[in-house]
């Protein structure tokens, strides 16, 4: 797997679709801070997005979509002057999967959210800006538009297994949105995500993710990237925020933590599978990274 696929798989990414929103005239709907990573896509018309803590509203055009990666209240509206109504009330009145605001049907949005397993905040969400906005005219955004159109069709026509298919399509959309964001704004992300935008660092990251149990050295990684050891070490540290071997240690611990959360494998077998020669070596590294011994983590996996 490549690093992005690896992390999204580790986090057990799932999507949840909500009712669509049809609006017209002058309207505004305010939403409480979502407990998931919220997404919306404008399928028809235009509107504004205001997010708590963000100074300027974002103009959304037909075909635009966005992710909210932080739990912040937000408002969708036609104009700045209209007083917002509570989104919970609006969506409680939804019929046939469609909520309505204002008068008319000038605007049509589909939306939902993404949920992740343990460790999502540190591994992924903190690496992204609070808002990831993908305008419809973004280069190479055709696949995002294809996924959104397919979701729209599934929700409109409701063939068999439409919800399941639409939710899987939403995950496909998420991956493409993240790809496009890395292409458009590589400096707006941090950590390993930022590393994917640097071809030298990305090569090293891919090697570490493909074979995390290998006894990698900086020289090995430099050879795969066709640069000197000093160049690789400097670029990796500057981009990712830590050295390649420190990153490897942390990724190994994430893999070990997943096995502790999800299975009954012995600590010895887990240690071997992620590149440690003994239980004690894994235990020392695990406590240094996550702040508790592996045995305690297995009992209380949500504590760090």
Curated annotation (Swiss-Prot):
PROSITE patterns assigned to the protein according to its UniProt record, in alphabetical order:
HTH_ARAC_FAMILY_1, HTH_ARAC_FAMILY_2
- Keyword Nucleotide-binding found: no
In Swiss-Prot or TrEMBL terms, this protein is called: Putative AraC-like transcription regulator
**Gene Ontology MF annotations:** DNA-binding transcription factor activity; sequence-specific DNA binding
Residue intervals of the HTH araC/xylS-type domain: 202-300
State the SUPFAM superfamilies in the record.
Homeodomain-like
Q: Which UniProt keywords apply?
A: DNA-binding, Transcription, Transcription regulation, Transposable element
Q: Could you confirm whether the keyword Transcription appears in this record? A: yes
One Pfam family hit? Cupin_6
Start-end of DNA-binding region: 219-240, 267-290
């Amino acid at each position: 797997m490549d690093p992005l696929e690896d992390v999204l798989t580790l986090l057990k990414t799932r999507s949840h679709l909500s009712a669509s929103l049809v609006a017209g005239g002058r309207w505004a709907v305010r939403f409480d801070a979502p407990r998931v990573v919220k997404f919306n896509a404008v399928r028809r018309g235009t509107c504004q997005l205001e997010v708590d803590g963000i100074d300027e509203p974002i103009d959304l055009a037909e075909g635009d979509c966005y992710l909210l990666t932080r739990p912040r209240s937000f408002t969708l509206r036609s104009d700045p002057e209209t007083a917002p109504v509570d989104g919970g009330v609006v969506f409680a009145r939804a019929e046939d999967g469609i909520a309505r605001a204002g008068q008319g049907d000038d605007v049509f949005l589909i939306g939902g959210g993404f949920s992740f397993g343990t460790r999502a905040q540190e591994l992924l969400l903190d690496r992204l800006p609070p808002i990831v906005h993908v305008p419809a005219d973004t280069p190479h955004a055709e696949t995002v538009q294809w996924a959104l159109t397919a979701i729209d069709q599934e929700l409109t026509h409701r063939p068999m297994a439409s919800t399941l298919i639409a939710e899987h399509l939403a995950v496909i959309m998420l991956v493409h949105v993240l790809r496009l964001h890395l292409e458009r704004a590589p400096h707006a992300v941090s950590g390993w995500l930022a590393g994917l935008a640097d071809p030298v660092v990305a090569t090293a990251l891919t090697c570490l993710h493909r074979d995390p149990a290998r006894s990698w050295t900086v020289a090995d990684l430099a050879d795969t990237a066709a640069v000197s050891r000093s160049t690789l070490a400097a670029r990796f540290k500057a981009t990712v925020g830590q050295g390649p071997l420190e990153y490897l240690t942390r990724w190994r611990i994430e893999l070990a933590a997943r096995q502790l959360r999800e299975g009954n494998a012995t600590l010895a077998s887990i240690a071997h599978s992620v590149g440690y020669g003994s239980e004690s070596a894994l235990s020392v590294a695990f406590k240094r990274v996550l702040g508790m011994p592996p045995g305690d983590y297995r009992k209380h996996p949500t504590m760090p």
